[in-house]
Amino acid sequence: MNSTLILKGNILYTPRPSEFISIPHGYIIAVDGVVVYCGESIPPAYASCEVTDYSDNLIIPGFVDTHAHAPQYCNRGLGMDKELLPWLETYTFPEEAKFSDPDYARLVYGAFVQDLWRNGTTRSILFGTIHKESTLVLMELLQKAGLSAYVGKVNMDRNSPEFLIEKTQQSLIDTKEWLDASLQFGPLVKPIITPRFVPSCTSELMIGLGKLAEEYNVPIQSHLSENHGEIDWVASLHPESPNYTDVYYEHRLMGQVPTVMAHCIHLSDVEIDRMAETQTMVSHCPYSNVNLSSGIAPIRKLMKRNIPIGLGSDISGGHIVSMAKVLTEAIGLSKMKWVEVDQTYAPLTLSEAFYMATKGGGKFFGKVGSFEKGCDLDALIIDDTSIFDPNERTLEERLERWLYVGDDRHIVERYVAGYIVPNPQG
């Protein structure tokens, strides 16, 4: 028997980057978790169905975080005076080594999943660690919480500390075993192949991971062109390749299956061509790029090439889980790039940044991040009445105000694929 859900409230979403759709006191109808109608009135065929009325609250799509490191959750706000490579050595690698203990993983991942829920991140693309058991713990907790995610067991077999490095063949064996075990988590929580980045993966490992991605038909995530030191390092490790991007491409880690690359700040025009050709998604991580002094990604330039773009918190290079704040930071960074670097590329608009935080990143999951017909119903219910303002505001103004000055306390309900997601901690 089909399950029908009807939500009523002030609806806002972005079917395209340039356009907000706002429907005052409108209706969203979903059947078996998929939107079949979104409009001003209830079609006659559904007139007898029960309506969940959220009154004057805002109804927006759930947020999608396209890049975060779950094991780095306890490192938020630490080492923000360092650049990428020293930061990894000082803070990241020692913390990730602790996840050899599944009990420690359960403790930290439980807090991380709770924070995703609290901030309205209904879908995410996550790095775990090299430890397959702990990565399975993360997947289990996400499944139990009712949140959707791609989760990766990290691979790294070179240029890594002795306490956080794998043997090449064992890394591939562990990854295959982890992929097989991941099947138990169902449609909302899925595996993603995760070479940390080129400097930490030998060619043998990268080739093997590419084969596993194709064999299991699972996507790939990694980092690309985040920091000048990293780029120079890759060039010294792979002089046979014309650029950083093509190292991934030549090892069949880009384009064969859906791929998302975090950062992509310092790409050459040739590399941008490759990204467009392979339709590799960019995860733009504005807080991290500022905190680690990495640079400002040329987002408008990438948009003009029709490269898919989502937003990432990049915990813990980024220090804030809230995608509402990540998207406003993306707008702010684009303004700085426009003012200080290149006035040929206009700053991001609110609708463009909101699109990236919802439908833009949601495309990696399929039809997600919008209330258009055929999309999974992921939604947040926002009660903004406690934000003082005696003036009458449009729905778009109310949304903008909440994104900038509101917080998770205003999110009163969360839906994933048509189901209410209760507080994981009860």
What feature does the model see in each segment?
Residues 1-46, 57:
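N-terminal metal-binding scaffold of metallo-dependent hydrolase/deaminase domains
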Residues 10, 28, 33, 56, ...:
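Divalent metal-coordination and catalytic microenvironments
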Residues 16, 376-426:
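C-terminal cap of metal-dependent C-N hydrolases
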Residues 74-105, 153, 158-168, 227-256, ...:
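Active-site gating loops and adjacent loop-to-helix segments of metal-dependent hydrolytic enzymes
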Residues 76-147, 171-185:
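Alpha-helical scaffold segments that flank or form the walls of functional sites
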Residues 133-264:
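Metal-coordinating catalytic core of metallo-dependent amide/deamination hydrolases
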Residues 250-256, 300-388:
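His/Asp/Glu-enriched, well-ordered alpha-helical/loop segment
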